[in-house]
Amino acid sequence: MVSLISAHLLSLPSSAPRSRPQSRPPLSPPAAAAAASCSFDLPRPRRLVADGSRRKGTMAAAIPPEASGLAHDLGSAAVTAGVALALLRFFEELAKRGVFEQKLNRKLVHITIGMVFLLFWPLFSSGSYAPFLAAVAPGINIIRMLLLGLGVMKNEAMVKSMSRSGDPRELLKGPLYYATTITFATSIFWRTSPIAIALICNLCAGDGIADIVGRRLGQEKLPYNPNKSYAGSIAMALAGFMASIGYMHYFQSFGFIEESWSLAFGFLVVSVTAALVESHPISTHLDDNLTVPLTSFLVGSLVF
């Protein structure tokens, strides 16, 4: 039995020994370069922060510069109008409480509104629409003067702070000319023109200081106009000139204009001429808020 089993096992075919995997021959340089070109790396997971910043950059690039400048100027116009409104409300409250006499309060409004308004011009961009958006604040005052002067809107405190007699119809003259002048200077000439500086500084600082000084130190009257004094006219010329020089330097620091001695001399000529016209009786019959800016515009067009 055992011999039969042994004979059967010997008759079975022996299994071939397992061959070890033979190492491949090294590739030639051209074949290696081709194999490397076919290989690829799996993409690494990107961080969410990097992806978010890329998305923000894409969105910012999609917004045209004109749109971003317009949004900036709209915000600047809102800030400027808000400050102007706050100043008017402040002087209205002073008029209600009787902190200053009515004439002095009116002249403080006259000086402050225009001078502070100029400070906000550098907030706006260099876009072509910027001066018109900047003119929104004084433009709103034009509408308010019309509504108050025509009796459509009532505001006794504002009328008291901006008129001589408290009559609302008075706002249709001097205060309306005042707001129109600032709107015109802003939208037409803007911050690169010395004419705009001369217009607003002589109207606001010059004319305002002339009345304050003239009422307190104006004993010596002018020979051609007993309602005006030497002190008031000299104060107007100096105040308008100094304010113009100050804003020339202010706008030069932002690169809007280039200050020079010739420009300073031009401001002096405009301020002296405006003071002479303001002292003439014709300014009393018309309105110095009309004659002073007209003079500043005409003379400024010649000297600048």
From Swiss-Prot:
The keyword Transferase applies. The chain crosses the membrane at residues 68-88, 113-133, 134-154, 170-190, 194-214, 231-251, 256-276. Pathway: Cofactor biosynthesis; tocopherol biosynthesis. The keyword Metal-binding does not apply. It is a multi-pass membrane protein. It is found in: Plastid, Chloroplast membrane. Involved in the activation and reutilization of phytol from chlorophyll degradation in plant metabolism, including tocopherol biosynthesis. Catalyzes the conversion of phytol to phytol monophosphate (PMP). Belongs to the polyprenol kinase family. This is Probable phytol kinase 2, chloroplastic.
